[in-house]
Amino acid sequence: NMTKIEIKDLSILFGPEKAKAKKMIKQGKCKQEILKETGCTIAVRNANLEIKEGEMFVIMGLSGSGKSTLVRCINRLNEPSMGEIWLSGRNITSLSDKDLLQIRRKEMAMVFQHFGLLPHRTVLSNIAFGLELQGIPKEEREKKAHESIAVVGLKGYENQRVDELSGGMQQRVGLARALANNPEVLLMDEAFSALDPLIREQMQDELLDLQEKMKRTIVFITHDLDEAIKLGDRIAIMKDGEVVQVGTPEEILTDPADDYVTRFTESVDRGRVVTASSIMLTQPIVVRIRKDGPEAIIRKMREKRLYALPVIGTDEQFLGEIRLKDVLRLRKEGTRDISSIVMKEVPSVLENMTVEDMLP
């Protein structure tokens, strides 16, 4: 997968003596010390991220972790103090205002937590608003807006005023407005955080369905690890302006980088995330059909404290499984050939199936 967005050594400072604060960052001084000496707040410090094309990349952290500040740097709503941002192989940190405007209009779109809609306008004209600003003729912009309306499930609401809609419906308008532009990159800042839990779950599902079809690059910000795990192909966890870990949901749950991440992961329902491949035995004990007799099999089972073992044929082909009680019966009967007790109908799961889906 190609890299779509690259953030290199990015720091964002707010306050008076930025030059002095930058020096102190390079010297490795801590946030508190820099604030005390220069009056500068370090919102983001030395962030490095690579976001792949078509990936749903979640940036997660508590409030004050710098996640929103960082994302607003991608479309330069916030100016970086140090470092660079690259989009599709172009350094956008040094672009002129004119070029930047083109990128914001054509290549990126943003969805906000509190929707950011124009309450006195209808659904249709809210969705077409960005296209209107670009000077696109009415007929064409309304055609695009209608396509976008269909995608997010707002058909029939075109002429309603936005302030008459529920929160979930309003956020659908926000999403449709962002999509009307056909952006390559979608930035979503706590987009579902203001919604009721049930509506929120529904919007997450809809976003995942949309992403299946659209395959956009989405940077999604949240403070909620369950949401991050449900949505993210990969997750970056931020704390105090620094990126502390980047990984797939499973990597973050099974191998947290530090105590901070561990504390976050403690409340998560692992069954929804951990897959068969991460709990399976990587070097399983097997029974070889022509070679192993009851005595050897019982010994293997005792050693590993297992009541059943997989059976393989001469060509390493999986034949089924064998149960301890049946092996004990064979031994009692004095039979050496185990083929009569191999159970061929064995429930199986795919490697990427979650534990929750595996259990009845």
What is the role of each PLM region?
Residues 246-247, 255, 321:
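ABC ATPase "signature
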Residues 286-306, 312-313, 328-360:
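The conserved cystathionine-beta-synthase
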Residues 121-128:
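Short coil-to-helix segment of the ABC ATPase nucleotide-binding domain corresponding to the Q-loop/switch region
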Residues 23-33, 90-91, 128, 132, ...:
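Conserved ABC ATPase "signature" region
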Residues 83-91:
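Conserved ABC transporter NBD signature motif
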